[in-house]
Design a protein with these regions (language model features):
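Conserved ABC ATPase "signature" region
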Residues: 4, 56-75
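A short, surface-exposed alpha-helical micro-motif characterized by mixed small hydrophobic
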Residues: 147-149
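Hydrophobic anchor residue at the start of the ABC signature
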Residues: 94, 105, 118, 122
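Short, glycine/charged-rich "phosphate-handling" switch motifs in NTP-dependent
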Residues: 153, 165
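Short catalytic/signature loops enriched in Gly
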Residues: 71-75, 168-238, 250-253
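A short, proline-enriched helix->beta-strand linker immediately N-terminal to the Walker B motif
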Residues: 99-103
Length: 279
């Protein structure tokens, strides 16, 4: 039967949160209690939805942390949110949502804080769970490539209004709306290297009635390629040599354990260039 969620009280909504509807937010620090350990957060979710002991819940929580790519799971269980990186905190949020085995998962930019190597793992995990448990997923994102990979249908919105909707292949490959086409034109291409990245206003404008129409002055967009050559004579603005960085966590009453986050990293950044750092 149809349920109007807006009309429900907070107490009534408790019956739907978790096992029916779960959400992964973009910023995990707004959802995690800074006074509670990571293990506490996970165990509460498990015992709210499953009839298991605290010890059994701890085992399940550790296994879930491993699924979302968090190393040293037992140590992480004892840590607090501020002791984890932003990416680690987001993975904890994803684990909490998946533990509840919801019928509907609302994911608001869930992989934004993750590096590309973990992003693929998380997306594959979400997709496998969706199929295994017949779970529906509302995936909110600005990443068009990710939409094409994970979604069956897509809705393109602008200023709070729907501009176009339909099957993902139809919308992304044969878009009908001018705004959708402008978004797709803005995607960087490997074949060209413009002086600046194009924006939607380069490909559309408003007519006298305020309606969006295709831009006709695309020739004004400077797509001249820059030289990719690095001669070695360019000025180096940043040089890092054999950088090491470690963090320490409590172990026992007086001891502490080292976690080496950076292990002998070296690189140079030339003037006017962009260096992509993945990981």
């Amino acid at each position: 039967h149809i349920v109007d969620l807006v009309s429900l009280t907070d107490r009534q909504m408790c019956a739907y949160r978790g096992n029916k509807i779960a959400m992964v937010f973009q910023e995990p620090m707004t959802s995690l209690n800074p006074l509670r350990t990571i293990g506490y957060h996970l165990i509460v979710v498990i015992r709210r939805n499953q009839k298991v002991s605290k010890k059994e819940a701890e085992v399940l929580a550790i296994a879930e942390l491993e699924k979302v790519g968090i190393p040293l799971m037992k140590e992480r269980m004892r840590q607090y949110p501020h002791e984890l990186s932003g990416g680690m905190r987001q993975r904890v949020m994803i684990a909490m949502a998946l533990l509840a085995q919801p019928k509907l998962l609302i994911a608001d930019e869930p992989t934004t804080a993750l590096d590309v190597t973990i992003q693929k793992q998380i997306i594959d995990l979400l997709e496998s769970l969706r199929q295994r448990h017949q779970m529906s997923m509302l995936f909110i994102t600005h990443d068009l490539a990710l939409v094409g990979e994970i979604a069956d249908e897509v809705i393109v919105m602008r200023h709070g209004e729907i501009r176009e909707s339909g099957a993902v292949e139809q919308v992304l490959e044969q878009p009908k709306d001018v705004y959708t086409r402008a978004l797709l034109h803005c995607r960087p291409q490997l074949s060209t290297r413009p002086y600046r990245l194009p924006v939607t206003s380069d490909f559309m404008k408003q007519d006298e009635n305020g309606q969006l129409i295709e831009a006709t002055n695309l020739s004004e967009l400077n797509l001249k390629q820059r030289s990719r050559g690095l001669t070695g004579e360019e000025a180096i603005v940043l040089e890092v040599k054999d950088l090491k960085k470690s963090f320490y966590s409590r172990k026992g009453l007086w001891g502490r354990e080292e976690f080496q986050a950076v292990k002998g990293v070296s690189f140079q950044l030339a003037k006017g260039k962009t260096l992509g750092l993945v990981g």
